[in-house]
């Protein structure tokens, strides 16, 4: 395994040699420079993993802060630890603002320097892995659909992304709260920094406290695992998405509320760390009810819910199902090796007639299950038919291909049987198009007024939402 290259920049030869010896013993590969010219030349030849940089460099064209500025412009992810024997608080603050990873004064504790360096390298490694991962994994930041409600929601996401306010995303399980958070990050000014997800569900109070704020005091001196940065530190300059925020216990809510007031973390060792984070939270619960029942702090709710987004359920955007199915089939073909196939129109109709309590996640699972359980054999199963999808989906959706009363209709006069068919057929189509009169009439080939009369004649209820959706649709397609 190759050694980690570290550049030491100090005008004092003794200091350079001492630090180099320490790092060599710890398995690093130290490089040394006495001034800005040497330092920048070494970096130009081959960038290093980290830099230990003195501020006051006698006989150098640039001082440490000047070198730091150049490094952060050319190598933004490269961690720089500032050291100085003549530093002031103001100098330290300026260095951190300019992008230094940390600042320590001479004479420094050898162990402290090594721990700090290892931590800096670990953080940078994670950042690089995160960036690499973005180009390799499935694009999870695409909101698929062109229905009126989806287009409106996309516009709301764009507005939220342009704001620096905290955002709370409300939505049912599987509806796309995490996707919304990713989209906000992707469209924001923080897009080149980390997007971190924290889910407190199934975590103990102690574990949540450890992940967000650090180890307990009694553990501080026992091991070095607590030296790793907390999630709040990892997310610095980026976006932190807290999923199901209502699952955070009240004692941690109090600490989180305190953090939101000044964005500082007091580590168990006493060190104060200030961070700059965009915080987005998600919840499938009614937070106001949680507040009323004493399970969620009212003040915390108001601080997190500065901007609010409501994710539309899949039931509300059934028109997007054909596009979503095509999207999932393509993704599964690309990343799971399942052959790309077409879902028949009647299969799509059956999917649109289902209520989808599990939302987008459930639809994706159904598409995957269907492709796996119906492999192509001798040219068969190229087209996905209704009988191939899970039976529970068909059982709970209005079946357009086999009427429930088909046997009873054999004993009915034609007029009565036709009325039974029309009632079931139009009920299914209204459900499929989310009670939108315009879209239903267009699909079944009837004038809107004629469809209205037919529904009334068949005693089929027309919810008011159908008319509202219709108006929105007409405006969107004017």
UniProtKB/Swiss-Prot annotation:
SMART domains: AAA (SM00382), REC (SM00448). The keyword Transport does not apply. Keywords: ATP-binding, Nucleotide-binding, Phosphoprotein, Transcription, Transcription regulation, Two-component regulatory system. InterPro entries: AAA+_ATPase, CheY-like_superfamily, Homeodomain-like_sf, HTH_Fis, P-loop_NTPase, Sig_transdc_resp-reg_receiver, Sigma_54_int, Sigma_54_int_dom_CS. Gene3D superfamilies: 1.10.8.60, 3.40.50.2300, Homeodomain-like (1.10.10.60), P-loop containing nucleotide triphosphate hydrolases (3.40.50.300). Member of the two-component regulatory system RBE_0312/RBE_0470. PANTHER family: TRANSCRIPTIONAL REGULATOR (NTRC FAMILY) (PTHR32071:SF17), TRANSCRIPTIONAL REGULATORY PROTEIN (PTHR32071). This is Putative response regulator NtrX-like. It comes from Rickettsia bellii (strain RML369-C).
